[in-house]
Every structure is written in C-alpha cells, then in structure tokens.
Regions:
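Periplasmic/extracellular, small/polar-rich flexible segments of pilin-like filament-forming proteins
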Residues: 59-143
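Alpha-helix exit/C-cap motif
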Residues: 37-38, 48-70
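N-terminal single-pass transmembrane signal-anchor helix
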Residues: 2-31
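Juxtamembrane interface helices immediately C-terminal to a transmembrane segment
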Residues: 35-43
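Detector for the N-terminal beta1/A-loop initiation region of ABC nucleotide-binding domains
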Residues: 16, 34, 109
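Hydrophobic alpha-helical segments of small multi-pass membrane proteins
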Residues: 45, 49, 124-127
Length: 143
C-alpha cells in the first residue's frame, strides 16, 4: 500500500517566496509615499494654524509676534516637523528687531523619520504665499 505524501515541494515554496518579494518591491514605495504624504499634513495644518494665530495676534496688537512660543512652540503636533518664525520685512536676510512687525515667514522643517522626504521644508508668509524645498516634487505635489 502506497502512502501519499502531503506538503509543498521546495520549488513550490521558492515560487511563493519570489512572488511575495515582487509584490513587496512594488508595494513598499507606494506605502512609503503614502506615509510621507500623511506626515506632510502635519506641517501644512500647523503652518495654517500658526498663520491664523499670527493674524489674531495682529488684530489684537497691531503687529505680528516675533516669538514662536506665542503661536504654540517649535514642534508640530505630531512631532514630524520643527516650526520656526522669521521676521524680515526689509528683506535684508537678517531678522528684524524692534517693536512693530508687519510681515512674517513661517517654516516647517522635517525631522526624524520625515527628514528624508522629498518635500522637506514648507514655508508660509503673511500674504499666504506657500513655498517648499526638497529633492523633488512640485509645489502642487508637496502642498
């Protein structure tokens, strides 16, 4: 009486492993891009929120604040970006000092796992002009 052997051969197992490897190679870049895109929302939401707080500050004080702590601090809520505030109304690339400020530029710089993102830095100024810098992508892609 012959016994039938049940199970998988080594060849069948290797084919399954190869198929899984191909699927992983195709899926991982899409997954990474999706995660990066969702983390970018952290920067965009924080910039928009800080800009709104700047406008509120301006309405109450007739000047924008030059202290990021008045807007919520240097870390974005989810911690993927470091926020900074730069006041340079005369465009001489040095921070303005004095009492009354009529311009501002907010910057969100990627940190930690997000630092390798192709849209690494986002900016927003008092007129609502959005900017970005990084290794690739377009303004529409990043924003």
């Amino acid at each position: 009486m012959l016994r039938t052997v049940q199970g998988f051969s080594l060849i069948e197992l290797m084919i399954v492993v190869a198929i899984l490897a191909i699927v992983a190679m195709v899926a991982y870049p899409s997954y990474s891009e999706s995660v990066g895109k969702s983390r970018r929302a952290d920067a965009k939401i924080t910039l928009e929120s800080y800009a709104a707080l700047q406008e509120r500050w301006f309405a109450q004080n007739n000047s924008y604040t030059n202290d990021i702590a008045n807007l919520g601090g240097t870390a974005s809520p989810e911690g993927h970006y470091t926020m900074s505030l730069f006041i340079d109304c005369d465009s001489d690339a040095t921070a303005d000092t004095g009492g009354t400020y009529y311009c501002f530029k907010l910057t969100a710089t990627a940190t930690g796992k997000q630092s390798g993102d192709r849209c690494a830095t986002f900016t927003l100024d008092e007129t609502g002009v959005r900017g970005y810098s990084g290794t690739g992508g377009s303004k529409d892609h990043c924003w």
